[in-house]
Amino acid sequence: MKIFELLRDVLKDWLRQGEYTVWNMTDYEENGFVTITNNKALYLVEAKKFLLDFSKMELRRPSRKIIDSCLADKSKSEIIRFSHIEQPQDLEKLCVFTDFEGKKTEIAYNYLKYFDLNRIIIYEYRKDHPVLVYEYEDVTNEEVLRAIVMPFMR
């Protein structure tokens, strides 16, 4: 299942209620990105590398050392697949991020979420320092995915 299809399913109730708007669906085919927004946050989704197989459900212990080393290395910033961008007034959470065009961009973050295949990593920025909140591996069950992601999307 492709990422925007999954997200539309996860957010279908909110979409139906008009709380969320899906932007740039054509960009999915051209650039591999879909933008979803509401009044509180902007979600930029890198779509092409996120495919899920819902054939099994398995949660494993995280590999934090690998995650931290990748996040600390700015040259590996392409590992960031899914970012939750808070309002610009949250300047105490300012950090530097390489966006999908490769340009250095300063954005205020609350949560950083990394979705790679069936792996979910959620960071919270505290004074420009990313703190691991949750990591789940081999999450291929839709209900488990919803349970993990939904609290961070409200």
What do the PLM-derived regions correspond to, one by one?
Residues M1-R154:
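DNA polymerase processivity clamps
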